[in-house]
């Protein structure tokens, strides 16, 4: 697949994600006392869209297929170097937690391009006196598409964890699954500008 085809896939799925997010941006803000869980979520997405503090560069680093959940013949053939790139925007809330909107494309297990985009949130801890060092735990909600599923948009809700210092963060997720399907650790670097 050439570079232009990758750009076309990213544009196509960015439009789908934008159409899913746009209605949330029109939701009026309400006081904290009146918010329910879904309203809090949509307000956080909208605020991250409207008032980003940073722009982010995402660089996929590793995929690892859990060896206990796969036949060796499969893992020997799978790509575990997910070359790609992504961009996003993010902010830190008044509690010090991270919120981000992102779009990334990377080479999947079959060495085919896989776009993903969505919203991520992490509760952040700063266990050292140096506030630049942080740990995070949260989730991402978004949409992806895969070649082996004919690039049909697939919603995802996955856990997030991270360790960071200053503008650099090593962020990761785990895609659960069944035998020979899913059970993949995926990690990337996120650089904040």
UniProtKB/Swiss-Prot annotation:
The keyword Cytoplasm does not apply. It comes from the Bacteria. It catalyses: a lipid A + a 1,2-diacyl-sn-glycero-3-phosphocholine = a hepta-acyl lipid A + a 2-acyl-sn-glycero-3-phosphocholine; a lipid IVA + a 1,2-diacyl-sn-glycero-3-phosphocholine = a lipid IVB + a 2-acyl-sn-glycero-3-phosphocholine; a lipid IIA + a 1,2-diacyl-sn-glycero-3-phosphocholine = a lipid IIB + a 2-acyl-sn-glycero-3-phosphocholine. The record marks 74 as: Role in lipopolysaccharide recognition. One of its GO terms (biological process) is lipid A biosynthetic process. Its main location: membrane. Residues 1-32 form the signal peptide. InterPro entries: LipidA_acyl_PagP (IPR009746), OMP/PagP_b-brl (IPR011250). The active site is at residues 65, 108-109. The record marks 179 as: Role in the phospholipid gating. Pfam families: PagP (PF07017). Transmembrane segments: none annotated. GO terms for cellular component: cell outer membrane. Its EC number is 2.3.1.251. One of its GO terms (molecular function) is acyltransferase activity. It is found in: Cell outer membrane. HAMAP family: PagP_transferase. Belongs to the lipid A palmitoyltransferase family. NCBIfam families: PRK11045.1. Homodimer. This is Lipid A acyltransferase PagP. It comes from Salmonella paratyphi C (strain RKS4594).
């Amino acid at each position: 697949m050439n570079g232009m085809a990758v750009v076309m896939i990213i544009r196509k799925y960015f439009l789908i994600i934008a159409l899913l997010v746009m209605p949330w941006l029109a939701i009026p803000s309400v006081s904290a006392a009146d918010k329910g869980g879904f309203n809090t979520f949509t307000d956080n997405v909208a605020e991250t869209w409207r008032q980003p503090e940073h722009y982010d560069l995402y660089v996929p680093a590793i995929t690892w297929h859990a060896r206990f959940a796969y036949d060796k013949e499969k893992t020997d053939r799978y790509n575990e170097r997910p070359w790609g790139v992504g961009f996003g925007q993010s902010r830190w809330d008044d509690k010090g937690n991270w919120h981000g909107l992102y779009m990334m494309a990377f080479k999947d297990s079959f060495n085919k391009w896989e776009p993903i985009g969505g919203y991520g949130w992490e509760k952040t801890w700063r266990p050292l006196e140096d506030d630049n060092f942080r740990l995070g735990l949260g989730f991402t909600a978004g949409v992806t598409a895969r070649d082996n599923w004919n690039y049909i948009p697939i919603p995802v809700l996955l856990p997030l964890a991270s360790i960071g210092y200053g503008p650099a963060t090593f962020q990761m997720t785990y895609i659960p699954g069944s035998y020979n399907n899913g059970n993949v650790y995926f990690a990337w670097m996120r650089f904040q500008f």
